[in-house]
Amino acid sequence: MITMPKLFIYHANQCNPKKCTSLKMAKMNKAILLKNPYKVPKNSLILNPYAEKALSPEDKEIVEKFGITALDCSWKEAELMFKKFKFKNQRSLPFLVACNPINYGKPCMLSTLEAFIAALYITNFKDEAWDLTSCFKWAETFIKVNYELLERYSNAKNSMEVVEIQQDFLRK
């Protein structure tokens, strides 16, 4: 039996509900949907594409104890949303390629589901990451396309090493 770390989503209602990965995750009991940003668990790891520190395997303990929170908002509104709320334990995901139908092939334009899969994989909750792919038919493709990078990131010692791996990959 897979013990999934708690996954929280602050949903800003800025998307098409029929295509929303967050709403489907909540419907499948894979994540807890929060309608109020002030209900975000204060010690959870916050996925923030603008955070200065990259997610790394050294964050596993935070994920295990307090879970992961994603803010589901439009990419057009994202920067403003993250500036508006101040959270502890903010981490950015390293370079990965989106495989969702809306942003397929675009670097770093991940859906909330892809962000959770990446965060779980990098913090060495790999079985749990694979389990999340059951939410959408295309989700398994995300791990397959990014497999080499996800493996390298998950073997890094710390955030600095994750950034080095990312820079090395982007130089090639």
Swiss-Prot record:
<dbReference type="GO" id="GO:0106388">
    <property type="term" value="F:18S rRNA aminocarboxypropyltransferase activity"/>
</dbReference>
<feature type="binding site">
    <location>
        <position position="21"/>
    </location>
    <ligand>
        <name>S-adenosyl-L-methionine</name>
    </ligand>
</feature>
<comment type="similarity">
    <text>Belongs to the TDD superfamily. TSR3 family.</text>
</comment>
<keyword id="KW-0949">S-adenosyl-L-methionine</keyword>
<dbReference type="InterPro" id="IPR007209">
    <property type="entry name" value="RNaseL-inhib-like_metal-bd_dom"/>
</dbReference>
<keyword id="KW-0698">rRNA processing</keyword>
<keyword id="KW-0808">Transferase</keyword>
<dbReference type="InterPro" id="IPR022968">
    <property type="entry name" value="Tsr3-like"/>
</dbReference>
<dbReference type="GO" id="GO:0005737">
    <property type="term" value="C:cytoplasm"/>
</dbReference>
<dbReference type="GO" id="GO:0000455">
    <property type="term" value="P:enzyme-directed rRNA pseudouridine synthesis"/>
</dbReference>
<protein>
    <recommendedName>
        <fullName>16S rRNA aminocarboxypropyltransferase</fullName>
        <ecNumber>2.5.1.157</ecNumber>
    </recommendedName>
</protein>
<dbReference type="Pfam" id="PF04068">
    <property type="entry name" value="Fer4_RLI"/>
</dbReference>
<keyword id="KW-0690">Ribosome biogenesis</keyword>
<dbReference type="GO" id="GO:1904047">
    <property type="term" value="F:S-adenosyl-L-methionine binding"/>
</dbReference>
<dbReference type="Pfam" id="PF04034">
    <property type="entry name" value="Ribo_biogen_C"/>
</dbReference>
<dbReference type="InterPro" id="IPR007177">
    <property type="entry name" value="Tsr3_C"/>
</dbReference>
<feature type="binding site">
    <location>
        <position position="93"/>
    </location>
    <ligand>
        <name>S-adenosyl-L-methionine</name>
    </ligand>
</feature>
<keyword id="KW-0963">Cytoplasm</keyword>
<feature type="binding site">
    <location>
        <position position="112"/>
    </location>
    <ligand>
        <name>S-adenosyl-L-methionine</name>
    </ligand>
</feature>
<comment type="function">
    <text>Aminocarboxypropyltransferase that catalyzes the aminocarboxypropyl transfer on pseudouridine at position 914 in 16S rRNA. It constitutes the last step in biosynthesis of the hypermodified N1-methyl-N3-(3-amino-3-carboxypropyl) pseudouridine (m1acp3-Psi).</text>
</comment>
<feature type="binding site">
    <location>
        <position position="71"/>
    </location>
    <ligand>
        <name>S-adenosyl-L-methionine</name>
    </ligand>
</feature>
